[in-house]
Amino acid sequence: MNRQLVVIALLLAGLAARVQAHNAICDCYDNGDNTITCEGGFSDGGTAVGVPMRVLDEAGKVLIEGAMSDRSDFTFTKPDVGFRVEFEGGDGHVIQIDGRDIEE
C-alpha cells in the first residue's frame, strides 16, 4: 500500500513540474505611432505563433481579434476607448494586459 502511495506521489509531482515548466509570456508596448505591438511565447522556449489575441473594451466587448504572427507578435491600432489585451495561450494560459499599463 505504501509503495503505491509513493508511486502516485511521484507521478503527481512529475505532472506538477511539467505543468509549471510551460508558462505563457506576453508583453505589449506602444509604438508611438498610434499602434500597439504585443510579443509572446512560453517559458519553455516555445513560440506563440498562431496564439489567439483579442482587444476588448472595458465592458468586455471584442474590438479587435487576431493571432500572433510567425514572429510571435501582434500589432494593432490603438483603440480610442479604454481597453485590455488578451493572450489566449490554451490550457489555462490566459494573460490580460490593461491598456493603461502599456508604455512606449
Regions found by a protein language model. Give the residues of each.
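Sec-dependent N-terminal signal peptides
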Residues: 5-13
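Beta-strand-rich domain onsets/edges
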Residues: 19-37, 59, 98-103
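Short solvent-exposed capping/turn motifs at the termini of beta-strands
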Residues: 40-44
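Short beta-strand/loop motifs in extracellular/secreted proteins, especially
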Residues: 49-51, 83
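Short amphipathic beta-strand segments in non-cytosolic proteins
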Residues: 52-65
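Glycine-centered loop-to-beta-strand initiation motif
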Residues: 67-76
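Short, aromatic- and glycine-rich surface loops/edge beta-strands on solvent-exposed regions
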Residues: 81-93
